[in-house]
UniProtKB/Swiss-Prot annotation:
An example Gene Ontology biological process: endonucleolytic cleavage in ITS1 to separate SSU-rRNA from 5.8S rRNA and LSU-rRNA from tricistronic rRNA transcript (SSU-rRNA, 5.8S rRNA, LSU-rRNA)
Ranges of Polar residues composition bias in the record: 22-32
Coiled coil ranges: none
Protein name according to UniProt: Pre-rRNA-processing protein pno1
Location, primary (coarse class): cytoplasm
Encoding gene, per UniProt annotation: pno1
Length: 252
C-alpha cells in the first residue's frame, strides 16, 4: 500500500506551501495593530492642556493670538493741491506716529499727490490702517497735526463735513460771504466760542465746514453753525452754547 501513502504525502506539500501566506496575513494584522494606536498619543497630546474644575467641567487653556498680519493691506489718501505745502512742512510730525505707534509703512507720493499707507509684519492692531487713514485725511481737511493726532489716541472721535449751501441753497455772492463771516466772527471769535463750548474743532475751507469731535459734541457744534447760517443773531447762539456748556458740566 505505498501508493496511498505517497498520495497523502503529496497532498501535505501544498499545505506546507500555504503556511507562508498564513504567516504573511498574521504579519499584516500585526503591522495593522502596530499602526492603529499611533493617533492615540496625538489625541492625548491635544487634551494635555485640559484640566477639570471643581464642578467637574473641562477647562482648556486659551489659544494665544499670534498678533501678526496675515496679508499686506494698502491705503492711498489723496491730498488736495492747497494742502501739499503744509504736508511737506509738517511731514516730520506726521510720519512718526504712523510708524512708531501704529507700526505702518508710509510714504509721500509727490507725483500722484497722495500719502500711501501699508501694513507690515510688525503691525499688530487690525484697525491700525484705518486709524492712519483717518489721521492723514483729517490733516488734508485742514486740521492741525496736534488736533488730528487725537484720532489715534481716542476711539470715539468722528469727522463731519457739510457745505454751507446744503443748509441754505439760496446763498450766493455776498450773501454767501456774509454767512461765512458770521460763522468765523471777528478775528475768529465766534468759531473759537463754538469750539470751546462744544469741545470740538471746526475748520472753514471756502464753503465747506468740517467738524472734529465726539458724536454728541458734533451735533451741538453743527446746530450752532446752522443757526448762524440761517440768520440767527450771534448773541442768541452764544446764549444757547452757554446753556449747553452748563448742562455738560452738571453731567460730568
Amino acid at each position: 500500500m505505498p501508493a496511498p501513502t505517497a498520495l497523502l504525502r503529496k497532498s501535505d506539500e501544498p499545505l506546507s506551501a500555504e503556511e507562508p501566506s498564513l504567516t504573511f496575513s498574521s504579519d499584516a494584522q500585526a503591522s495593522g495593530q502596530g499602526e492603529a494606536p499611533s493617533p492615540i498619543p496625538t489625541e492625548s497630546a491635544q487634551h494635555s492642556d485640559m484640566r477639570i474644575d471643581e464642578e467637574s467641567r473641562p477647562v482648556f487653556t486659551p489659544i494665544t493670538d499670534a498678533g501678526t498680519v496675515l496679508r499686506v493691506e494698502t491705503r492711498k489718501v489723496p491730498v488736495p493741491p492747497h494742502r501739499m505745502t503744509p504736508l511737506k512742512a509738517n511731514w516730520p510730525k506726521i510720519y512718526p506716529p504712523l510708524v512708531e505707534h501704529l507700526k505702518l509703512q508710509v510714504r509721500m507720493n509727490i507725483k500722484n499727490r497722495a500719502v500711501e499707507l501699508r501694513t507690515s509684519k510688525f503691525t499688530t492692531d487690525t484697525g491700525a490702517l484705518q486709524k492712519g487713514e483717518d489721521f492723514v485725511k483729517a490733516f488734508t481737511l485742514g486740521f492741525d497735526v496736534d488736533d488730528a493726532i487725537a484720532l489715534l489716541r481716542l476711539d470715539d472721535l468722528y469727522i463731519r463735513s457739510f457745505e454751507i449751501r446744503d443748509v441754505k441753497a439760496s446763498l450766493n455772492g455776498e450773501h454767501l460771504s456774509r454767512a461765512i463771516g458770521r460763522i468765523a466772527g471777528k478775528d475768529g471769535k465766534t468759531k473759537f466760542a463754538i469750539e470751546n463750548a462744544s469741545r470740538t474743532r471746526v475748520v472753514l475751507q471756502g464753503t465747506k465746514v468740517t467738524i472734529l469731535g465726539r458724536f454728541r459734541d458734533l451735533g451741538i457744534a453743527q446746530e450752532a453753525i446752522v443757526s448762524l447760517i440761517l440768520g440767527s443773531p450771534p448773541g442768541k447762539v452764544y446764549g444757547n452754547l452757554r446753556k449747553v456748556a452748563s448742562r455738560m458740566k452738571e453731567r460730568f
